[in-house]
């Protein structure tokens, strides 16, 4: 049976997971330290961390008895590619608009 993959947008749709990602931009945290930032149980935070890990947004490193979470750049590739697609789309549209407006401005000056 194939392992289901997680859609990056579904993963970051949850505000708690986005907050975890933002916290991890500052430093690596162990799971207990992350849980202290939320008004939910440690198992609930662990579930969010598991989802982020499965989706590739974070790595988990075991140091002694502690598990530390760190951001993983690879998890953001799908998001970046999607955003870049629309960035290119809008850049192209705005460039075409600029060319059209410049042509109209030149034509109006000739009159």
Language-model-derived ranges and their functions:
Residues 9-10, 68:
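Short basic coil micro-motifs at the edges of alpha-helical modules that engage polyanionic partners
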Residues 14-15:
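Helix N-cap at the start of a conserved alpha-helix in ABC-type nucleotide-binding domains
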Residues 18-20:
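Pre-recognition alpha-helix immediately N-terminal to the DNA-recognition helix
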